[in-house]
């Protein structure tokens, strides 16, 4: 029984924490499960990630970001996500195409149809069964990052992060049935309880 679950949200919203918790929970249930992330998730993809997040030697335009993110995505899908789904496993991915649309489309201002087209080409049209959106005020979320040095995206101004948040909201509005929207400022235990509830329902439907 294959299932594709993605986590989305702005910087510092707790995606990584919750995706790891869900992975551990499903493994304890004895279910075949793969945890991965974007950008990266593969050796080649991780090299692209370092360029995207930390390069200071050259200017990286929004269009270049779009193409690099999707190059990394294509590698990840071909080598990790599709094989796992074909093997009947549950795949949990920290970020996916919605992030690219929110960041490079709404955040950077690239044409939304162009972003959607490139995303679709790179993903082969693969759409998540469930997308968990952890929504949080961008200023509060960035405070969670602590004293770690910020990458290129974390370093952007508040206006950028607000546009990204608005972008996720716009995506959610067009496909509400695919999403589980959660307030990321809630206690982590409460957030995870709601995630477990939704995933359990989804697993039950798939087993019928």
Swiss-Prot record:
Q: What keywords would UniProt list here?
A: ATP-binding, Kinase, Nucleotide biosynthesis, Nucleotide-binding, Transferase
> Single GO molecular-function term?
dTMP kinase activity
Q: State the Gene3D superfamilies in the record.
A: P-loop containing nucleotide triphosphate hydrolases
| One GO process term, biological-process aspect | dTDP biosynthetic process
Cross-referenced SUPFAM superfamilies, in alphabetical order? P-loop containing nucleoside triphosphate hydrolases (SSF52540)
What is the top EC class of this enzyme, as a single word? transferase
> EC number(s) per UniProt?
2.7.4.9
Cross-referenced NCBIfam families:
DTMP_kinase
Q: Which HAMAP family match?
A: Thymidylate_kinase
Q: According to its UniProt record, which protein family does this protein belong to? A: Belongs to the thymidylate kinase family.
- Protein known as: Thymidylate kinase
- Gene name per UniProt: tmk
């Amino acid at each position: 029984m294959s299932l594709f679950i993605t986590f989305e949200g702005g910087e510092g919203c707790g995606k990584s924490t919750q995706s790891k918790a869900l992975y551990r929970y499903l493994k304890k249930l004895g279910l075949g499960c793969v945890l991965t992330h974007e950008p990266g998730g593969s050796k080649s993809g991780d090299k692209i990630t370092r360029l995207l997040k930390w390069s200071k030697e050259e200017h990286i335009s929004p269009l270049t970001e779009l193409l690099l993110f999707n190059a990394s995505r294509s590698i990840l899908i071909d080598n990790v996500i599709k094989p796992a789904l074909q093997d009947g496993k549950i795949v949990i991915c920290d970020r996916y195409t919605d992030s690219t649309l929110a960041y490079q489309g709404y955040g950077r201002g690239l044409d939304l149809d162009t972003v959607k087209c490139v995303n679709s080409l790179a993903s082969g049209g693969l759409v998540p069964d469930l997308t968990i959106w952890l929504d949080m005020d961008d200023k509060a979320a960035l405070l969670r990052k602590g004293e770690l040095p910020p990458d290129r995206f974390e370093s952007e101004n508040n206006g950028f992060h607000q546009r990204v948040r608005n972008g996720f909201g716009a995506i959610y509005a067009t496909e509400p049935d695919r999403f589980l929207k959660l307030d990321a400022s809630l206690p982590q235990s409460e957030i995870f309880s709601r995630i477990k509830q939704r995933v359990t329902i989804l697993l039950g439907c798939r087993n019928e």
